[in-house]
A protein has these predicted regions:
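Short, well-formed alpha-helical segments that are part of the catalytic scaffolds
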Residues: 7, 11-25
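Acidic donor-binding segment of Leloir-type glycosyltransferases
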Residues: 20-60, 78-82, 87-89
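The conserved acidic donor/metal-binding loop of glycosyltransferases
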Residues: 94-99
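Conserved donor NDP-sugar-binding/catalytic core segment of glycosyltransferases
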Residues: 103-140
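Short, flexible, basic/aromatic active-site loop/helix in glycosyltransferases
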Residues: 141-164
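A short, conserved alpha-helix in the catalytic core of glycosyltransferases
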Residues: 166-182, 189-215
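Active-site donor/metal-binding and catalytic loop motifs
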Residues: 208, 212-230, 240-243
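Non-catalytic, C-terminal membrane-associated alpha-helical segments of glycosyltransferases
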Residues: 231-239, 250-305
């Protein structure tokens, strides 16, 4: 199985450079890596990385937005995979602040080779800094991967392969049959919240999407480059409703997701928890509800906030 990687980055050139270092240490080095930023500062310094100078990776710029940038990456891979059997290659999407274990790509490739019914994979996240104030440091990421630090409790932990309805966007791989046929929904702009669920939900028409415990890694959860609290809060309501309307998310899942986040935003605002902009998120929630009541709710409206 030939492995390809797409990295969409925004405001994190340093973190992306480090990820390229991790990819060069993979036991199955990717056949090619596409890095997609939205402006020069997103990719500053990356042109000097050996993977780029040696032609194993290349850098592109596009309009900003996770879904847009990932689609540009997929389109850029088209000539690289031309002539290959779509069942014999896969593409992995890593967040720029994800740190994969050395055998991540090899494990994913072997799983796809051994199990033709599997079309999508997400891995076991040993630590996830996305919900903490400062995230996980690069030094601690190494400790988690080396086993010097015990893994944190995370929903992605499992002892065996587990069938899922959605994959985790910071580390997910898809067989070529999916990557050739599907693109990310660009109606989910900017940070593209729940774009991973939408894409993997649509991928299930081609086979199973699963949690693969042997694909281990750490998500730093770096805060730079993220959407504002108000915008993110708007997306917390607008995006699930949009996906439920299009059929890639059940209304039950959407309602559970929205209520969980709304309650969390209220509680953390009242208790003045400041690790994230929870008052901003709550304001965004209310703006989305207002748009819903007036028939104007649209994920793209986040661009005007």
């Amino acid at each position: 199985m030939k492995a390809f990687v797409v990295i969409a980055t925004k405001g994190r050139s340093k973190e992306t450079y480090t990820l390229l270092e991790y990819l060069d240490r993979q036991t199955d080095i990717p056949a090619h890596v596409v890095i997609v930023g939205s402006e020069d500062k997103d990719v500053e310094g990356l042109a000097s990385h050996p993977s780029v100078t040696e032609g194993r990776a290349h850098i592109l710029l596009s309009r900003a937005g996770l879904t847009i940038q990932r689609n540009v990456g997929l389109d850029a891979l088209a000539p690289k995979v031309a002539g290959l059997d779509a069942k014999e290659w896969f593409v992995t999407f890593y967040d720029d602040d994800f740190r994969p274990a050395p055998n991540w790509l090899e494990s994913a490739g072997q799983a796809l080779k051994d199990s033709p019914h599997i079309v999508g994979i997400t891995g076991n996240v040993l630590a996830d800094g996305v919900n903490s104030e400062f995230g996980v440091s690069e030094e601690d990421a190494v400790r988690y991967l080396n086993g010097d630090k015990a893994p944190e409790s995370h929903w992605s932990f499992a002892h065996s392969v587990k069938t899922l309805t959605g994959l985790y966007g910071c580390n997910m791989a898809y067989r070529g049959t999916v990557a050739t046929a599907l693109r990310f929904d660009e109606n989910l702009p900017m940070y593209g919240w729940q774009e991973d669920f939408d894409y993997s939900s649509r991928a299930r028409q081609y086979g199973q999407v699963v949690l693969m415990p042997t694909c281990r890694g750490v998500h730093l959860g770096v805060s730079s480059g993220r959407t504002s609290g108000v915008r993110f809060g708007y997306s917390q309501i607008a995006n699930p409703i949009f996906l439920a309307r299009k059929g890639s998310m059940t209304w039950r899942t959407a309602a559970k997701l929205m209520s969980k986040n709304f309650i969390a935003n209220v509680a953390k605002t009242l208790f003045m928890i400041r690790i994230k902009d929870f008052p901003g998120r709550l304001k965004g929630n209310f703006q989305a509800v207002r748009d819903l009541m007036t028939g104007k709710l649209n994920p793209l409206h986040v661009l005007d906030i």
